[in-house]
């Protein structure tokens, strides 16, 4: 026996039925879709339609609302500022503002629309005395900066 003489056992591999390929094929003309109607057309599914019963979207109650006065903050941590100071992207001598954080690529803030809040996650000690002018601070971040001799403007 050679490679070119290999073949499947009889009945091991069945050819799929090719639909809509002539009336004599057994699945021709309408191709198993019946006659007329929505389901015989292309793009059959109607989103959310459940066959006449009240759809799930209507059975569930409306809940909540979107508060327009909610403040959305860009969250940064003290270690993000430490990394930027170590890389030389920020200077410890200057007042650190939102604009300087954007320039140093610590905050991604398009058009300065979002506020910036400083947290102290993963930071228990902070040595550099910085003067910061941001929109909000966590209580632990305030304590760490003031303990290091920094100022919150």
From Swiss-Prot:
<dbReference type="InterPro" id="IPR036227">
    <property type="entry name" value="Ribosomal_uL15/eL18_sf"/>
</dbReference>
<keyword id="KW-0689">Ribosomal protein</keyword>
<comment type="function">
    <text>Binds to the 23S rRNA.</text>
</comment>
<comment type="similarity">
    <text>Belongs to the universal ribosomal protein uL15 family.</text>
</comment>
<dbReference type="InterPro" id="IPR021131">
    <property type="entry name" value="Ribosomal_uL15/eL18"/>
</dbReference>
<dbReference type="InterPro" id="IPR030878">
    <property type="entry name" value="Ribosomal_uL15"/>
</dbReference>
<dbReference type="InterPro" id="IPR005749">
    <property type="entry name" value="Ribosomal_uL15_bac-type"/>
</dbReference>
<keyword id="KW-0699">rRNA-binding</keyword>
<keyword id="KW-0694">RNA-binding</keyword>
<feature type="compositionally biased region" description="Gly residues">
    <location>
        <begin position="23"/>
        <end position="35"/>
    </location>
</feature>
<dbReference type="GO" id="GO:0019843">
    <property type="term" value="F:rRNA binding"/>
</dbReference>
<dbReference type="GO" id="GO:0015934">
    <property type="term" value="C:large ribosomal subunit"/>
</dbReference>
<dbReference type="GO" id="GO:0003735">
    <property type="term" value="F:structural constituent of ribosome"/>
</dbReference>
<feature type="region of interest" description="Disordered">
    <location>
        <begin position="21"/>
        <end position="42"/>
    </location>
</feature>
<protein>
    <recommendedName>
        <fullName>Large ribosomal subunit protein uL15</fullName>
    </recommendedName>
</protein>
<dbReference type="Pfam" id="PF00828">
    <property type="entry name" value="Ribosomal_L27A"/>
</dbReference>
<keyword id="KW-0687">Ribonucleoprotein</keyword>
<dbReference type="GO" id="GO:0006412">
    <property type="term" value="P:translation"/>
</dbReference>
<comment type="subunit">
    <text>Part of the 50S ribosomal subunit.</text>
</comment>
């Amino acid at each position: 026996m050679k490679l070119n003489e290999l073949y499947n056992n009889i009945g091991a591999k069945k050819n799929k039925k090719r639909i809509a390929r002539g009336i004599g094929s057994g699945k021709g003309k309408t191709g198993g879709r019946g006659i007329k109607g929505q389901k015989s057309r292309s793009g059959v599914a109607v989103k959310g339609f459940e066959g006449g019963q009240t759809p799930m979207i209507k059975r569930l109650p409306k809940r909540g609302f979107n508060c327009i006065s909610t403040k959305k903050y860009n969250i940064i941590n003290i270690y993000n500022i430490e990394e930027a100071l170590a890389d030389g992207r920020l200077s410890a001598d200057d007042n650190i503002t939102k604009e300087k954080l954007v320039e140093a690529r610590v905050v991604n803030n398009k058009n300065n629309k979002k506020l910036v809040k400083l947290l102290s996650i993963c930071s228990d000690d902070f040595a550099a005395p910085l003067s910061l002018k941001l929109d909000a601070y966590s209580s632990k971040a305030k304590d760490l900066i003031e303990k290091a001799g920094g100022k919150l403007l």
